[in-house]
Amino acid sequence: MKKKILSLIVFLIPFLSCKQHVHSEVVIYNNDFESSDLTNITGGIIGQFNGSNVMGQFSNGDFVLSLNNLPAHDLITVSFDLYIHDNWRGELLPDGPAIWEMLIDGGPYINTTFSNLDCKEGNICPPQSYPDNYPNNNHNPRSGAYRTDLPGVCSMKTSPNGTTMYKITKTFKHAGNSISFECLDKLDQKDYPDPKCEKSWSVDNISIKAISL
């Protein structure tokens, strides 16, 4: 019996240790926007935040980055910095949900909400969906944030934590010759005289890699 078990273990070891290895990884796009380069981007605008160029600020807006003639690949990794500026309130009504989306080739990969509301420990606070997709009311404001100590840009410009920074990284199967990367919001701001001042968003340091297995 012991010999049979040992033989089975020896037989299984190669299969248990098998995993996909990265054959090659090619950066097909990288942009920190310091040169104000918007090549291949539709709807892009250059702004300044915290002493640096960013793409934004957007409010009820979007941009689409389109790349063609990609090298052969099996996976794509997209990474970027997302700045949520000013008075985002997550899923708090009446002007919620404050939805933000990321789409790849027209399909949603992120559909979530963000909140910059202050939430003291022990309090029940209006939630945001991130780092999960909407609807999800299990996360306090600024959950999953990389930085929470950045100033606002307009309606919360006097607040030292009026902007929240998120580092977003997504890897997904992809083998096509081209790719479109889109970010947008679905903010309800009809009751505000200056919607962009009330809440906006921007991105920076976009990097896209094509990975071959």
Spans of model-derived segments:
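Extended, low-complexity, turn-rich repeat/linker tracts enriched in Gly/Pro/Ser/Thr and Asp/Glu
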Residues: 84-95, 119-121, 189-193
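Short carbohydrate-recognition loop motifs
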Residues: 45-59
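Terminal, low-complexity interaction segments
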Residues: 137-213
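Extracellular/luminal beta-rich ligand-recognition
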Residues: 107-149
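Bacterial Sec-dependent N-terminal signal peptides
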Residues: 1-24
